[in-house]
């Protein structure tokens, strides 16, 4: 083992020169001056051999780590699948528990209602609702005692009938006939007593004897009927016994199956106390299962992160391996032993041990996760047991409700019928009002649809008008531009005309002066020409003034036409 601490490792993998990498810390560095070249070569060879061995060991370790990593990844995937399966089962169990709890509550409410109705029916049977409960309880107890007495008498009669059947089958000795005679005599006496107690006028002895004979005949027929009925009851009892025996056999087979399953799940039976505690906790708070599942999901994520860290560490180890190989090649080229090789060897050993410790820690964590998954499985078994128990309770409650419903179906309450009739009337009224509302809504919807159609038509017309307006506007703008161009051309032509006229007048004056040569006449002609030129200018000014001036009232811009002025005014105002 190296005594080098964790803080001594550098980023490049080199060790410091202050402490030795391998051996005790008090050991000093060997001096190279004390060794001969032959010894140095031997040490170099030994170091090369050790480096080669370390390379092979690193390769084996890397392969083993890769295999373990693959196994861990496969195991994590299996764990994820199992956890997803357990989560789905737990969700289904929760949903079933909630549904069963709701059904149990409903059944309890129905039982309470049925109990109240039975009490009301008892009160209706008594006739007076003001009768106290003590009297009703006394009557119920009397009825119970009568029922018990009748059941005891029935059992005695069944025993007597069975004895009679056995005696008839065996041949019928004298004692049996004596018993039969005694029974017949007792029953005849009872019949005679009934005849005597029956009301009616007293007649002669012959009439009494005839009545007694008829009574005995009737009694014998009644006895035969009772015997046949008892035989039928016995047959039904035997059939019930056979059915019960079959059910017992099936129950025993199920018990054997459950015992086999219990033997198979011996490991889960050792944790029965924990299961009971968990059942109590689940009964107290069913939401703990979801929290535990979330905790397990978090643990899975942490394990996945740790696996990623292990993968990064493996990549770092491979990089370290490459660096060590490069260093070994450099050492082989130099053929000179240095203390850095010893330090690198110590670092490699330290890194290998560190990776082994990490692998051991990962194994321990995996074992912990396996234990947790086993605990979750046990929790699921407990949930299934609770689910089965709740199902049994639910079935029992359904049976009780069916029995109570059968009893109530025989005695239907008029109050309930009246309430139901009232509810039906209210429902019919509500339906009628809702149908009226629906009709009104349909009418409003039809109106709105018509309005929408008209709106669509109006929008189309608006679009057509807008397109026409834009086209007219563009045409007016073009006309305005053409008019402006024509006005400019006219102004240019007027200027050219003025210049041409001035030149012509000058030329004519010069010609006149050259022809006549007289100054006086020239002066008169000049005055005449000046007057003529002034008249021409006044005419041009009048023509220009006659052109109408269209100016904007807002910005004062002069425009040639009314259309262009209107377009400009609309744009300027907007």
Curated annotation (Swiss-Prot):
A motif (UBAN) lies at residues 468-473. One of its GO terms (cellular component) is trans-Golgi network. Pfam families: CC2-LZ, NEMO, zf_C2H2_10. Residues 38-170, 233-496 form a coiled coil. The modification Phosphoserine is found at residues 177, 198, 336, 521. Present in aqueous humor of the eye (at protein level). Expressed in trabecular meshwork and astrocytes. InterPro entries: CC2-LZ_dom, NEMO_N, NEMO_ZF, Optineurin/NFkB_EssMod. Keywords: Autophagy, Coiled coil, Cytoplasm, Cytoplasmic vesicle, Endosome, Golgi apparatus, Metal-binding, Phosphoprotein, Zinc, Zinc-finger. Phosphorylated by TBK1, leading to restrict bacterial proliferation in case of infection. GO terms for molecular function: identical protein binding; K63-linked polyubiquitin modification-dependent protein binding; protein-macromolecule adaptor activity; zinc ion binding. A motif (LIR) lies at residues 176-181. Induction: Down-regulated upon treatment with dexamethasone. Not regulated by hypoxic conditions. A zinc finger (CCHC NOA-type) spans 544-574. Residues 1-33, 262-292 are annotated as: Disordered. Zn(2+) binds at residues 552, 555, 568, 572. It is found in: Cytoplasm, Perinuclear region; Golgi apparatus; Golgi apparatus, trans-Golgi network; Cytoplasmic vesicle, Autophagosome. The keyword Amino-acid biosynthesis does not apply. Transmembrane segments: none annotated. Plays an important role in the maintenance of the Golgi complex, in membrane trafficking, in exocytosis, through its interaction with myosin VI and Rab8. Links myosin VI to the Golgi complex and plays an important role in Golgi ribbon formation. Negatively regulates the induction of IFNB in response to RNA virus infection. Plays a neuroprotective role in the eye and optic nerve. Probably part of the TNF-alpha signaling pathway that can shift the equilibrium toward induction of cell death. Self-associates. Interacts with HD. Interacts with GTF3A. Interacts with MYO6. Interacts (via UBAN) with ubiquitinated TFRC. Interacts with GTP-bound Rab8 (RAB8A and/or RAB8B). Interacts with TBC1D17. Interacts with TBK1. Interacts with TRAF3. Binds to linear ubiquitin chains. Interacts with LC3 family members MAP1LC3A, MAP1LC3B, GABARAP, GABARAPL1 and GABARAPL2; OPTN phosphorylation increases the association (at least with MAP1LC3B). Interacts with RAB12; the interaction may be indirect. This is Optineurin. It comes from Sus scrofa (Pig). The gene is OPTN.
């Amino acid at each position: 083992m190296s005594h080098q601490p964790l803080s001594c490792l550098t980023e490049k993998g080199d060790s410091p020169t202050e402490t030795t990498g391998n051996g005790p810390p008090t050991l000093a560095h060997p001096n190279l001056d004390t060794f001969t070249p032959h010894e140095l070569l031997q040490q170099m060879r030994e170091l090369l051999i050790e480096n080669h061995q370390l390379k092979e060991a690193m390769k084996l370790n890397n392969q083993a780590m890769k295999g373990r990593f693959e196994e861990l990844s496969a195991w994590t995937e299996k764990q994820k699948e199992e956890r997803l399966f357990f989560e789905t089962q737990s969700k289904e169990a929760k949903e079933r528990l909630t549904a069963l709890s709701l059904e149990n509550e409903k059944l309890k409410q129905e039982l309470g209602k049925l109990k109240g109705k039975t009490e009301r029916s008892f009160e209706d049977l008594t006739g007076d609702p003001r009768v106290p409960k003590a009297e009703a309880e006394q009557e119920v107890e009397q009825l119970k005692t009568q029922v018990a007495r009748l059941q005891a008498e029935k059992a005695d009669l069944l025993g007597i009938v069975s004895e009679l059947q056995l005696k008839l089958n065996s041949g019928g000795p004298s004692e049996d006939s004596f018993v039969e005679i005694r029974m017949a005599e007792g029953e005849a006496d009872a019949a005679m007593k009934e005849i005597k107690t029956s009301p009616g006028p007293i007649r002669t002895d012959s009439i009494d004897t005839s009545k007694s004979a008829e009574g005995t005949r009737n009694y014998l027929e009644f006895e035969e009927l009772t015997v046949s009925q008892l035989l039928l009851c016995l047959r039904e009892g035997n059939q019930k016994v056979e059915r019960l025996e079959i059910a017992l056999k099936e129950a025993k087979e199920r018990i054997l199956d459950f015992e086999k399953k219990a033997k198979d799940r011996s490991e889960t039976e050792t944790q029965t106390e924990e299961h009971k505690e968990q059942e109590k906790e689940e009964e107290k708070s069913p939401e703990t299962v979801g929290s535990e599942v979330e905790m397990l999901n978090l643990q899975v994520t942490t394990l996945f992160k740790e696996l990623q860290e292990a993968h990064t560490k493996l990549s770092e180890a491979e990089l370290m391996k490459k660096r060590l190989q490069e260093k070994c090649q450099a050492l082989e080229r130099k053929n000179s032993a240095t203390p850095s090789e010893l330090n690198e060897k110590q670092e490699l050993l330290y890194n290998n041990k560190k990776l082994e410790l990490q692998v051991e820690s990962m194994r321990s964590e995996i074992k912990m996760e396996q234990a947790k998954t086993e605990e979750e499985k046990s929790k699921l078994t407990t949930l299934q047991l609770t689910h089965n128990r709740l199902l049994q309770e639910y079935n029992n409650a359904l049976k009780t409700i069916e029995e109570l419903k059968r009893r109530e179906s025989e005695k239907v309450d008029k109050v309930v019928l009246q309430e139901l009739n009232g509810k039906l009337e209210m429902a019919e009224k509500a339906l009628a009002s809702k149908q009226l509302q629906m009709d009104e809504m349909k009418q409003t919807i039809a109106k709105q649809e018509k309005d929408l159609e008209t709106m669509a038509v109006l929008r189309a017309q608006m679009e057509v008008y807008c397109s026409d307006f834009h086209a007219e506007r563009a045409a007016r703008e073009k006309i305005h531009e053409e008019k402006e161009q024509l006005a400019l051309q006219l102004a240019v032509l007027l200027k050219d005309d003025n210049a041409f006229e001035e030149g012509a007048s000058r030329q004519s004056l010069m010609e006149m002066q050259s022809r006549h040569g007289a100054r006086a006449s020239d002066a008169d002609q000049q005055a005449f020409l000046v007057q003529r030129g002034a008249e021409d200018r006044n005419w041009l000014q009048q023509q220009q003034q006659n052109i109408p001036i269209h100016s904007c009232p807002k910005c004062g811009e002069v425009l040639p036409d009314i259309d262009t002025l209107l377009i400009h005014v609309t744009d300027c105002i907007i």
